[in-house]
Amino acid sequence: MLTLLCCRNFSKVLRDSKVSYRRDSRYIFSVVNSPSFWSLSKTIASAPTPETPINERERKRLFSLSSASGMDISPICALVLSGKTAAENETAKLLKRNDTLKLPDDTEISVLLHSERDKPLEGNEFRIDLYLNALSTDTFGRFLIWSPRIPSTQDVISHNFSNLPLGAVCVADVQFKGRGRSKNLWESPPGCLMFSFTIQMEDGRIVPLLQYVISLAMTEAIKDISNEEGLPYIDLKIKWPNDLYVNDLKVGGILCTSTYRSKKFNVTAGIGLNVDNDEPSTCLNEALSNLSSTPYKFRKEDILAFFFNKFERLYDVFINQGFRALEDLYYQTWLHSGQRVIVQEKKEDQVVENVVTIQGLTSSGYLLAIGDDNQMCELHPDGNSLDFFKGLIKSKLV
């Protein structure tokens, strides 16, 4: 039996495995009946020592296991650069020649041009040419950074923002330190579309509304693909403020971070969408198979291209006409019109709970609701709950 010492907080349930674990412990966890993973034992008697040579196959499998458990191993991250036209490809050559791109914590990277890559595609690798051929934007998504495995697409974009063209996108097949709300870190397995891209905005008042435009663009992109391919409509919905749901199960999320420099907000927008991995909940292709016997499957490359094609148009409306011009379309897609929620309101030294009905969004991007007393109010999260609809705080609107 081969063994591996796992780190704390190893709570990931391995597919097709019977897993026994102890949260917040330093023990090794036992994994049995798994076709994909080695068995792990509480004894380390047979574990290879630093002096014990292991072959390449063993090394890769050990690395796969240790990465899944969150161990601190920093391999070289490969970044493949490409562009829609010669102009973007010249930018790619310049970035490579000047060794411009960096990652946090001095993570070692290897930069390669897509035109230099002679390795055949493997498995579910992102197909760059398929994506670029489907892209029809003027700005967004035309410069691409792809990696088979990387800590975080958000880090690639935010750490190199000033050196990248506007609308540049980084997409990864696997990321093992994906960013979430409240600085949560996520491991994103194969089958997910994970990408981040650059946006610059001047009006800070509308930056919080950008995530709504992004989520709307993704739902509309899935509709466009379905219409083009003659597929049944998948009811992809928006859960405020930044999640995507199918059949009451989460399949995606949006994260926007920004910095202010030279009178502009540099926004890094990150999106994760479960396209073809039905664990731990569901994915787009599973939802499609439940609706139709079609052999068609959603492809990450099409979704990314259709997303940018739609986002660029919606973003133009957003900047020039405001979010009000998109509200009707947004409300058709979100989950909350008419939803009744319990909110908290401070009265003197007590916290009183009231039931209100959601009406829409306020100009600042929070929830607009009405109480049983017909008093309009703004709802915002308390920042302590993973569920935005637990612990909502009520503020009266005059």
Residue ranges of predicted features:
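N-terminal lobe of the biotin/lipoate ligase/transferase fold
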Residues: 2-227, 231, 392-398
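Conserved, helical-rich catalytic subdomain that frames metal- and/or nucleotide-binding sites
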Residues: 291-354, 359, 388-398
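SH3/SH3-like beta-barrel fold
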Residues: 366-371
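Structured surface patches comprising rigid loops and adjacent beta-strands/short helices at the edges
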Residues: 372-398
